[in-house]
């Protein structure tokens, strides 16, 4: 894991299944790799180059050179924008040119904490009710779950090309 704790990883997995449940051949957002996608995204700057832009132009899955697994270096402005988006402004002047920014890392940490330590022990209806109380977290996780399920597996989701 890169950013999430084991507990946070499990919570993200469960929430992804609540948001994108298994149906037909689709295994659900959890099994499809949402937590891995989120963990890699929130920890993108643990890698060099950061895991933001997969290379290309081909994945190699259907011909061509497999270059998606080779991530591209970011420009100075791209790094600033992505660090601000992921980490928040953190009081750093160059990240606050348009005001303070709450980063995704903080949204996830606060949202998971607000769900409570016993979240995983609740039944599905109680879990859905708990998610409704943290809309900023739930909205961001839903966006990331969709990206994880339908995006390129090199970003950590769409396990076994599930979607």
Question: What positions do the PLM features span?
Answer:
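Long, amphipathic alpha-helical surface segments
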Residues: 132-163
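C-terminal segment of N-terminal export signals and the immediately downstream linker at the start
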Residues: 1-14
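Flexible, low-complexity segments enriched for small/polar residues
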Residues: 12, 16-140
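Generic, ordered loop/turn and secondary-structure boundary motif
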Residues: 4-5, 21, 151, 162
